[in-house]
Each structure stands twice: as C-alpha cells, then as structure tokens.
Regions:
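Long, low-complexity, charge-biased intrinsically disordered regions
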Residues: 1-126
C-alpha cells in the first residue's frame, strides 16, 4: 500500500518533514579511518524503513481497490504508522531509528545528527 502524499497539504496534513541525511564528510572520515586501520566494514539496509515510524498526525486513507471491507465499503483507515508516499515518512523513520539507537547506548555525533557511535571494549560501532 502506498499513500498519495502528493495530495497532502502543508500545515493541514503534516508539520515537520525534514529528515537529516548523512553528511558526506562523515562518510569520508569513516571510510578513511577503516582503510587506515585495515578494519572490516559492514553495511546494512532496512528494506521496510518507512513502514516502521509511528505517525504523529491524524492521517486517513481510502481502502485500496480490491481490498474494500464488504461490511464497510465506504469507510477509511486511520494510520498508526507511516506508509510509503507520505511526506512525513522520512522524518518518522529517523526519529524511530534515533530512539532505538539511544536506548542501545549509542551517542549522537555533535556535528552530524545522523552519526551514531558506540564503543564496547575495543569495538566501535558506527
């Protein structure tokens, strides 16, 4: 299911939508550090990232064609989490990820709010 974010109106359907992205300088420094110290670097991708963030605004969507509830064909669905296509999806995902990493004792970078680090013994998680 994909929301029709193009129909959303700023100030009415959504407020803050800015979501920080990794600074290129942070990526360069990380890669230089890994290369200099001959370390292994692992990368991950969260495929359903935009489906995990809780939504703070009230958003209703129509029932998708072919999936209408036969008892209530004219009803709409109230969203509890963001969907692909909503303007607030990137920010909701960032906030969800940030809260999770902070609970796991990661620290937010001072110059880059997308840089989270955690040191455990000799290991550094970035």
């Amino acid at each position: 299911m994909v929301a029709q974010g193009f129909t959303q109106i700023e100030g009415l359907d959504f407020g803050k939508i800015y979501a920080p992205v990794a600074r290129l300088e942070s990526i360069h420094i990380l890669l230089a550090y890994v290369t200099h110290h001959d370390l292994k670097l692992y990368q991950m991708d969260v495929k359903s990232a935009f489906l995990n963030g809780p939504i703070s605004e009230l958003v209703y969507v129509e029932q998708p064609p072919g999936f209408e509830d036969p008892k209530f064909p004219n009803h709409v669905y109230k969203l509890h989490k963001v969907l692909y296509g909503l303007k607030q999806a990137p920010r909701a995902w960032y906030e969800c990820l940030k809260e999770f990493l902070l609970r796991k004792d990661f620290e937010i970078g001072k110059a880059d709010p997308t840089l989270f680090t955690r040191k455990v013994d000799k290991d550094i998680f970035v």
